[in-house]
């Protein structure tokens, strides 16, 4: 059959920019999927999706004008029902055949197949393959129905009385197979043709008559002044942004923001990047405020210098390319000034009140109807932060003479004071004008206002950092004060929400509990904090009084699940992760070394046998119940059990010393020498001896082995 390339375009009014790329991919993807299902494509068909503010389109290679005919086998009825005793068709069979367009003459051609219960009659025929126009009609209907958009518009067609529903009103439909229009294809009250429209203002030809499916993109670019491909348009904008920054000079660069680049790509069809500027006086306002208002409200790209500081220049992606762009530049500069002036006004007004003076206002801000106000929340965070700071200082002071002294007490008092001040003030920027206008700046503005109030740097940094990490890969708080307050804030959220039953379900996680749990894990691990997980959770629960149930065990499971997922994402195998997590390690800071030790152990020749033996030991001890690890040497009778005991006495102290020093890899490698005596023990010794004393002694020996082998991880999880 004659393969030709297919082009389908739906020309519409301006589509929602944040959804455009997803809409384009979905529209094209469903078209291809439906055509494939109907046998209208080849094995080598390729899809290209197009999406611009006013069009969704798909180009599919090697599309057939009609699908191949195919044999169809239809089950009729059991032979006993369809044929009488003399082999003649029954009325039931004749009626069924008539419905299929056949008669008694076709009875000899019926196929008999045994389906496991009885012999059944099948009618075989050739079904005509679907014509492309019919197949595309079905595919187009499906693609329109399945567009991933939560809200659609209802609008009237040109006849004045028919209403249709779509994301935006549609005004044109192109359907070309090669250069031929697929006559009869319709969608949303439109009939397919070969004409579309280019840029509203800059098209050199209107309408654009598409000559063939393959000329679509080039004709739109040359005649319609439109870059139809989302990816090509995005790349062109990125190129122009960098070129404009290079023209400005001084090492400036446009802000790196993929979401903004995607949104701007969805707003223009012919991008033209222009350099604009604002008054330098506005740079006295925190740059986060200026950057956010330019990005969020105006879709501008701020320019940063080599040190990441905001400059007074910014880039605009225009949808028109006039010979003299001065009017466009001046218009954008005029529009941005009031936005920046508002930000400056908010900043100046907010600094007229100190953060401390705003604390009482938090009592009027509802946090959650079951957990009270932000004011109550602040008191809980203070309670938890104090407990964490005390635990942290105590752990750091162990073996540190400088901290375990009068100077250490002064340092502890300073830490506790800074932590308490930061926890008290961390949420106060929620009642400032700036954060009221830009909620994304919470924490950040608190840090600026703390500096303005003359608070210590540690407190200001902690207020700014206490929401960190906000997302995967985000920076962690800079100093211990910030880490403590950030931990307290996240634990307050986790313990509180779990305590009232607000758990994540499926894709729903409105309080970002998964992100909070990962934040706790990252801080404990990456900051190498000597803090125990259960102790942290235990310190948080009392802060809530009788408002919540104690769900610490359930929350710990949740955190370990997040930790396991994080480790798997880092490339560790499920067995390696299970081996470490099975012990529910309290010091999460030690987990990276533990799992690396397990990985190294798993490469040893002795590992499979020891893992299998460990699994066997685990099962034996589980059945035995409570087992005393004490071994009476006088009751050791068999050479194999004596050898195992001697090996344990010789190598376990060394392995334990290595474990206690934190060298987990060396500890496991030291224990690898136990393979031979362990194998011999299971070959030659009856653990469940009839004599009770012997049985208990041998169980005790295995308990001793089990305790030695499983300090780093549950090695039985490595057994295949």
Curated annotation (Swiss-Prot):
It catalyses: tRNA(Gly) + glycine + ATP = glycyl-tRNA(Gly) + AMP + diphosphate. Its main location: cytoplasm. Keywords: Aminoacyl-tRNA synthetase, ATP-binding, Cytoplasm, Ligase, Nucleotide-binding, Protein biosynthesis. GO terms for cellular component: cytosol. It is found in: Cytoplasm. InterPro entries: DALR_anticod-bd, Gly-tRNA-synth_bsu, Gly-tRNA-synth_heterodimer. Its EC number is 6.1.1.14. GO terms for molecular function: arginine-tRNA ligase activity; ATP binding; glycine-tRNA ligase activity. One of its GO terms (biological process) is glycyl-tRNA aminoacylation. Tetramer of two alpha and two beta subunits. Belongs to the class-II aminoacyl-tRNA synthetase family. This is Glycine--tRNA ligase beta subunit. It comes from Acidovorax ebreus (strain TPSY). The lineage of its organism: Bacteria, Pseudomonadati, Pseudomonadota, Betaproteobacteria, Burkholderiales. The gene is glyS.
């Amino acid at each position: 059959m004659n393969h030709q390339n297919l082009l389908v375009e739906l020309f519409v009014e301006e589509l929602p920019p944040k959804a455009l790329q997803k809409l384009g991919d979905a529209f094209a993807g469903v078209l291809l999927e439906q055509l494939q299902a109907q046998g209208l494509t080849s094995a080598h068909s390729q899809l290209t999706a197009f999406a611009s503010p006013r069009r969704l389109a798909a180009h599919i290679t090697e599309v057939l004008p009609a699908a191949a005919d195919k044999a169809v086998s239809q089950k009729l009825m059991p032979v006993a029902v369809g044929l009488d005793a003399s082999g003649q068709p029954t009325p039931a069979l004749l009626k069924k055949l008539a419905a299929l367009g056949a008669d008694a003459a076709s009875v000899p051609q019926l196929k008999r197949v045994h389906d496991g219960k009885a012999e059944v009659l099948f009618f075989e025929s050739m079904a005509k393959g679907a014509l492309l126009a019919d197949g595309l009609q079905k595919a187009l209907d499906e693609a329109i129905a399945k567009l991933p958009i939560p809200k659609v518009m209802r609008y009237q067609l040109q006849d004045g009385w028919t209403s249709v529903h779509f994301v935006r009103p549609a005004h044109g439909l192109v359907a070309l197979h090669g250069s031929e229009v697929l006559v009869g294809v319709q969608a949303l009250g439109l009939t397919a043709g070969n004409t579309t429209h280019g840029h509203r203002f800059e098209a050199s030809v209107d309408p654009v008559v598409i000559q063939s499916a393959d000329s679509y993109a080039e004709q739109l670019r040359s005649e319609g002044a439109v870059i139809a491909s989302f990816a090509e348009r995005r790349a062109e904008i990125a190129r122009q942004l960098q070129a404009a920054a290079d023209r400005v000079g001084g090492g400036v660069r446009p802000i790196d923001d993929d979401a903004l680049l995607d949104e701007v790509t969805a707003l223009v069809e012919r991008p033209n990047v222009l350099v604009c500027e604002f008054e330098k006086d506005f740079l006295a306002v925190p740059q986060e405020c200026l950057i956010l208002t330019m990005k969020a409200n105006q879709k501008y790209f701020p320019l940063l210098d080599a040190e990441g500081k905001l400059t007074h220049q910014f880039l605009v992606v225009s949808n028109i390319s006039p010979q003299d762009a001065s009017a466009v530049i001046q218009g954008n500069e005029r529009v941005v000034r009031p936005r920046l002036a508002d930000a400056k006004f908010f900043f100046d007004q907010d600094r007229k009140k100190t953060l401390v003076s705003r604390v009482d206002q938090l009592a009027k801000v509802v946090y959650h109807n079951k957990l009270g106000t932000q004011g109550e929340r602040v008191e809980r965070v203070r309670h938890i932060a104090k407990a964490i700071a005390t635990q942290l200082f105590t752990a750091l002071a162990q073996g540190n003479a400088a901290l375990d002294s009068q100077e250490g007490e002064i340092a502890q008092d300073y830490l506790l004071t800074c932590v308490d001040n930061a926890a008290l003030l961390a949420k106060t920027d929620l009642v400032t004008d700036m954060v009221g206008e830009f909620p994304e700046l919470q924490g950040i503005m608190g840090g600026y206002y703390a500096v303005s109030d003359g608070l210590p740097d540690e407190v200001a940094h902690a207020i700014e950092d206490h929401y960190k990490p906000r997302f995967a890969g985000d920076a962690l708080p800079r100093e211990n004060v910030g880490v403590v307050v950030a931990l307290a804030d996240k634990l307050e959220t986790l313990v509180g929400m779990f305590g009232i039953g607000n758990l994540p379900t499926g894709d729903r996680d409105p309080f970002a509990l998964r992100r909070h749990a990962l934040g706790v894990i990252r801080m404990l691990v990456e900051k190498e904090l000597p803090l125990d997980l259960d102790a942290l959770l235990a310190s948080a629960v009392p802060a809530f009084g009788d408002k919540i149930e104690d769900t610490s065990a359930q929350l710990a499971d949740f955190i370990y699940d997040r930790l396991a997922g994080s480790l798997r994402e880092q490339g560790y195998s499920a067995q390696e992760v299970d081996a470490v997590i099975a012990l529910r390690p309290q010091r999460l800071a030690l987990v990276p070394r533990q799992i690396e030790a397990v990985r190294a152990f798993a490469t040893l020749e002795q590992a499979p046998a020891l893992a299998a033996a460990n699994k066997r030991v685990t099962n034996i001890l589980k059945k035995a119940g409570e087992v005393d690890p004490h071994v009476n040497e006088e009751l050791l009778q068999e050479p194999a059990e004596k050898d195992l005991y001697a090996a344990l006495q010789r190598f376990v102290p060394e392995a334990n010393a290595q474990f206690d020093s934190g060298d987990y890899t060396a500890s496991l490698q030291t224990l690898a020498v136990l393979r031979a005596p362990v194998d011999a023990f299971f070959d030659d010794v009856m653990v469940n001896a009839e004599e009770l004393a012997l049985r208990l002694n041998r169980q005790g020996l295995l308990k001793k082995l089990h305790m030695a082998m499983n300090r780093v991880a549950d090695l039985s999880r490595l057994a295949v």
